[in-house]
Amino acid sequence: NFKLTGRYTTDHFSAAFVSPLYDINKQNWSDELNDNIVDLEKLPELVWTDEIIGNITKTASNETGLAEGTIVTSGTIDAAAEAISVGVIGTGDMMMMYGSTMFYILVTDKVLSDKRLWYSPWLFKGEHSSMGGLATSGTLTHWFKNNFAQELTGDDTFIRLAQEAEKSPPGSKGIVFLPYFSGERTPIHDTNAKGTFFGLDLTHNRADMYRSIFEGIAYGTNHVIDVYK
C-alpha cells in the first residue's frame, strides 16, 4: 500500500494475527504492550478492508503501468480475500479452503471466545470472524506420492491415486490416519503432535493408505466443526 499510495496501512483482519500487539477487544494497537516493544507511530494505520486508502501515485504509475490516480483499497491477506471471492460476506457464511493446509473462516455477529479457535475482526466494521485450520492437507498427498507412488508421473498422477483410493471401502479397511505431519493447529494447538497410520497389517495396500489420508483430513475438519457446534 505504501509503494502504491505513500500511506502505511494494514487492515484489522490482518493485524489481529499479531495479537496481543493488536488488542482484539479495543480493535486497536495495544498501548500497554507496544510501549515496551515498538513506538505506536511506527506501526501501520489500521483501516477496514474495504476502505479507500488513497490513489496510485505518479511514481507508482511509472513503475507499475497502473494509471495515476487509480483508487486503492486496503485489501487483506490471501485466505480472507479467497473467502470473499466465494461469497463469504455476512454472518453465518463460512469457507473451507483446501490447499497445502486447511483453513476455515466463519463470519459471526459477535466475538466467539474459544481458545481452541482463532479470532479476528472480519473485513467489514461491525462483523467478526472465527477461524480454524489444519497444518497439513495437500502437503500430505504430495508426501505420499513422492514416497509411495514414484512410478506415477504426469499431470494425472493425483487423479490416478484418487481412483485407486476409490477401490478401498469407507474406513480404509480399518486404517486410522492422524494427519499431524507438521504438528497441528486447531483445535489442539500442538506443534509436537505426530502423524500416524494406525491398524496397518499385511492385507492393506497403497489404495487403503491413500484413502485413509483423505479420511484423516476429513476427520480433522470434523474436529474443528464440532468445536463450532
Predicted regions and their residues:
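Active-site core segments that coordinate phosphate-bearing ligands/cofactors
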Residues: 1-37, 51-229
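Core alpha/beta catalytic barrel or barrel-like domain that forms the active/cofactor pocket
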Residues: 45-51
